[in-house]
Structures are given as C-alpha cells and as structure tokens.
Amino acid sequence: MRNLFSVEGKVVVMTGACGILGATIVKHFAEQGAKVVLLDLERTREVAEGLIAEIKAEGGEACFFPTNVLDKEVLEQNYTDIMAKYGTIDILLNAAGGNMARATVQPDQTIFDLDVEAVKLCTELNLFGTILPTMVFAKTMVEKKCGSIINFSSESALRPLTRVAGYGVAKAAVSNWTKYLCGELAIKFGDGLRVNAIAPGFLLTNQNRALLTNPDGSLTPRSHTILEHTPYGRFLEPDELVGTLQWLASDASKAVSGTVVVVDGGFDAFSI
C-alpha cells in the first residue's frame, strides 16, 4: 500500500536549521528517509556538525552549508552546492527568523518611543528571510513543476500580542506572502507547486526563555497568562510540530496550498 505521508528519498532544505525547533525537525525528516540540508549562520557550524553526526549515526543523510538568508549571492552559492550534491530540491522549509527585543513598545514606553529601525530589521529578517530563499531555491521546483514550500508564521500573526509588536507584524506578512505565492506559482507553473505555512503557538526556545521563565526556572507572570488562555494548559514541545510539517511536505496534502496551519494547543480558538 502506498504511504501518502512518505518523504523517503526527498531532498529537504531548511533555513534556520540549528535552533531548538530546527534540530528537532531536521532529525525527524532524516528519520523518515529524507536527505536533509541544514542551512544556518556560520556561527552554528558546531551545532550543525553535531546534528549531522546524530543523523548519520542513525543511518540518515544530512549536510550543512553556512548561509545568510538576507544575502541573495550567498543563497545562490548554497543553491549551486545543493544542486551539485543532490540534483534537486523537493521541500523547502523557511524557518529562519525570530523576535528582536527592541522591535516593540516596552512596558515603560509608549508608541512614540518605538524603535522603528528595530521593527524594520525584524521585518527584514522574518519576511525577506523567507522571500529570498524562495526566489532562489524554488527554481528547480518550477523546472520540474513539483515541490512543497513551507513557511514559518506564528501565533503572533493571528492576533496582536504584547511584547512582540515587530515580530507579529513580520509574521503576519509571512502569512500573507504564503497565500499570495500559492496562486502565483500554481497559476503560472502548475498545481504541483504548493506553498503553505505553519503557525506554531508557544514553545520554550532559546529566544523566548528569558521572557517566559525566571532565572530559577519558574514561570513568569507572562507565562501564566499564556497558559491560562491555552486549553492544553501547557507549552508545546518541538516534536509536536513535525506531524503537521510532514503532512504539508508529503503527497497527503497535495490539494492543500495557501493555507496557514495553526498548531497551538487551542490558544487561538479559546475565549472566556
């Protein structure tokens, strides 16, 4: 019987691959038989090499290329290297991005104190750090009229959240771009090209740990507020995203495009 969810033998390219989420995701796809390409900043090389060693020890296949998702010339070199190694790209995970603490109005500030330059930088990283890799890596998908692009949006794109103003604006733009690109690619290049996004809820990561936990590991008031509004009553775990990602990457979702899939333990759906 054919396995609709299979990604075996597929070439999966992931930007932002060396963070907590990225590490979990690339290991999952490698376990499923995909050939995984880790793209991240040069400073993450040691982490990447550790991940690759883990993957290869389990019989998987993976490689690392340092990148800068805001530098098209670097991305073009990545594309050349990937094509030389594997000859194709089947699945693109645009996960590079993140919040910037200065890109919001702090509790002791007003909107008139907003650091506009920080908001611009946050938007550039999250939005254009999604657009530019797509412009480069989707070329082979267009040529073969087949491929799945999965962008990383966020819960903060769905409703305005305090302390992440710039990040929320940027991720809302990623969601909008996802829907736009769905039509742009399918109409001009065929229905084998799909573009979707995942909008994760609250997970503890290196980026938000200081905001959500105290130095002793206990939860901050912000965390308690979040969990009170989450029907699951807990933070998500990184491995709770991989099933949705595999569905979007595989033929099981071949008629799904332009969709932002929310994985948040019910946060967005819950009301008092």
Predicted regions, residues:
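Short C-terminal tail/terminal secondary-structure segment
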Residues: 2-3, 159, 232, 245-246, ...
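Conserved glycine-rich Rossmann-like NAD(P)H-binding loop of the short-chain dehydrogenase/reductase
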Residues: 34-49
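Residue(s) in the substrate-gating loop at a strand-loop-helix junction
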Residues: 154
